[in-house]
């Protein structure tokens, strides 16, 4: 199934926040990404409907197996590319921003 870059970004953000904070709610995603509550709410609904996340009665977000697989793949790419760009002399902030853009478009072969 083809998944959009924005969905990959949401899944990656949920993964990173869960590693940092334990429990993750939509408001945490709003604060991390700087998007509106409405746009995050719509995205979370789509991710839930497509079987990528679950939302419990308290609003906590959990990555389901398909969502976790995508999030871990994207996050791994992000870390690899950030490190690579920093090795080229790019500052950490710029390296992370550029990695976020590149992580979605490079092939598996390129990243091996």
Where are these regions (language model features)?
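N-terminal helix-turn-helix DNA-binding core of bacterial DNA-binding proteins
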Residues: 2-35
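Basic amphipathic alpha-helical segments that dock to polyanions
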Residues: 10, 29, 40-50
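Helix-turn-helix DNA-binding elements, focusing on the entry/boundary residues of the two helices
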Residues: 26, 44, 81
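Residues within the alpha-helical elements of helix-turn-helix
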Residues: 32, 70, 87
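The short coil/loop that forms the "turn" connecting the two helices of the helix-turn-helix
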Residues: 34-35, 58, 90
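Basic, amphipathic "hinge/linker" alpha-helix immediately C-terminal to the N-terminal HTH DNA-binding motif
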Residues: 59-77
